[in-house]
Structure formats: C-alpha cells, structure tokens
C-alpha cells in the first residue's frame, strides 16, 4: 500500500539523524510553535479532505442518471462546501499564530523576526493563499468550486513546505546532521 511504501522510504531513504539543538533555539517557543503548526496542518488536512469530498459530490450531483454510491451517505455538495469553509476558518488563525510564534522565536534565537529562510517564505505563501481563499469566499461571492480550488492550492503549498522544502532546501530550519 502507499502508506507502507512511504513509511519504508522514510525509514530507509529519507531518514537522517537529528543534530543537537542549538542553545539559542532552546525556548518555550519551540513547543508552542511546533505544536500549533502541527495542529493547524492537521486541521488544514481535514479541510482539504472535505474539499475533495465536495468536488466529488458536486460532480456526482451534476451527473444525470448516476448510480448510487457511498457518497450518497454524505451531506450534499453545498453542505460539504460550507463545512470546508468553516474548517478553514478554524485552521487559518492557527496558522497565523504559527507564523507569529515562529517570528517571535526567530527574534529570540537570531535577533530578527524574518530571515527569508525557505521555510519562512513558504509558510508565508501558505498564509497568503489561504487568506486569498477566505477573502474570495467571504467577500467576492466566490462559492463552490472556484473558492475550493484556491483552498486546494493552499494545501499544495503545505505539501511543498513539508515535502520539498524540508528535503531539498538548506536554511535555518535544517536541523539534521
């Protein structure tokens, strides 16, 4: 299965020993920043899943003469879209706090709130994309698919931040030996 394959790759190919944490990084902000970041990504993952379910349900509902499926047990597309939006409303302030907590921690550790580290830049890109989604959904009347596609792009940025930036970029967030 894909999960077992990824776990196997993580253990054999992608694994690196973590180096000793620099003394300047030992702070209460480590626990706060990492915990809130992890929780906010979990909430964004739920929102992403709901967005995918919405797109599938919307397609099924617009298909004439479709056969019954397990999707009939889920709410209608409009309800799924509203739920997707509601979960993003919870996730976005958490991500905002993640970025702010990281900036406070960076100021303590390196003397600057912002250092143009690849992880910082992608965290800001994520924030901008989700802000655009929430703004478009709330004020410009973008409903349904148009808005959900922006949210899905935001989750794509999260994947880039954790899968690409962590593996291929070196910066202040690179702590492996």
Map each language-model feature to its residues.
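Short, flexible active-site loop motifs that bind/organize anionic cofactors or intermediates
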Residues: 25, 70, 111
């Amino acid at each position: 299965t894909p999960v077992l394959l990824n776990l196997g790759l993580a253990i054999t190919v992608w694994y690196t020993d973590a180096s000793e944490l620099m003394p300047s990084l030992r702070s209460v902000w480590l626990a706060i920043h990492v915990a809130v970041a992890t929780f906010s990504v979990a909430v964004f993952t739920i929102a992403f899943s709901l967005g995918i379910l919405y797109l599938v349900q919307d397609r099924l509902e617009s298909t004439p003469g479709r056969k019954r499926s397990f999707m009939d047990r889920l709410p209608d597309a409009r309800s799924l879209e509203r739920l997707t939006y509601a979960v993003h409303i919870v996730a976005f302030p958490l991500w905002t706090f993640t970025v702010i907590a990281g900036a406070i921690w960076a100021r303590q550790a390196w003397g600057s709130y912002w250092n143009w580290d690849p992880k910082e830049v992608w965290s800001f890109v994520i924030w901008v994309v989700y802000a655009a989604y929430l703004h478009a959904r709330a004020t410009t009347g973008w409903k349904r698919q148009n808005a959900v596609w922006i949210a899905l792009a935001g989750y794509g940025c999260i994947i880039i931040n954790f899968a690409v930036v962590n593996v291929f970029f070196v910066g202040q967030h690179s702590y492996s030996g």
